[in-house]
């Protein structure tokens, strides 16, 4: 029984002493990683604006190409709300103020001519 206690005590002392050493090593490793991380963060801070500028340039380029090759916008069908200043009603339809059923909507709708 005493040998079990002595063995347990010996293992406990070794675990505590090695645990302290590991704790110090871990602390030093964390300091090294944070120092390396600062360099990485500086690199990332410089890289991020460059990437954003590249993406923005690509998007603007796509928009300009799209506007050159764009087709006419789709038209609005009958009985659908439209904008009186920019009517996009299909051919044969006109953007008019509603009569009877839609008076309370305060909007314009596409109607047949």
Curated annotation (Swiss-Prot):
Pfam families: Toxin_22 (PF08092). One of its GO terms (molecular function) is toxin activity. Disulfide bonds join 75-90, 82-95, 89-110. It is found in: Secreted. GO terms for cellular component: extracellular region. Residues 59-69 have a biased composition (Basic and acidic residues). It comes from the Eukaryota. Keywords: Disulfide bond, Ion channel impairing toxin, Knottin, Secreted, Signal, Toxin. Residues 22-74 form a propeptide. InterPro entries: Toxin_22 (IPR012627). Residues 1-21 form the signal peptide. Expressed by the venom gland. Residues 59-83 are annotated as: Disordered. Probable ion channel inhibitor. The presence of a 'disulfide through disulfide knot' structurally defines this protein as a knottin. Belongs to the neurotoxin 14 (magi-1) family. 01 (HNTX-16) subfamily. This is U11-theraphotoxin-Hhn1a. It comes from Cyriopagopus hainanus (Chinese bird spider).
């Amino acid at each position: 029984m005493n040998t079990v206690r002595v063995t347990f005590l010996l293992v406990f002392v070794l675990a505590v002493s090695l645990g302290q050493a590991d704790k110090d090593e871990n602390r030093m490793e964390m300091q090294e990683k944070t120092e390396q991380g600062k360099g990485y963060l500086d690199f990332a801070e410089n890289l991020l604006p460059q990437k954003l500028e590249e993406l923005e340039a690509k998007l603007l380029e796509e928009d300009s190409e799209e506007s050159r090759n764009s087709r006419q916008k789709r038209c609005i069908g009958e009985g659908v709300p439209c904008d009186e200043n920019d009517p996009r009603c299909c051919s044969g339809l006109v953007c008019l103020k509603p009569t009877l059923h839609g008076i309370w909507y305060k909007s314009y709708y596409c109607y047949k001519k």
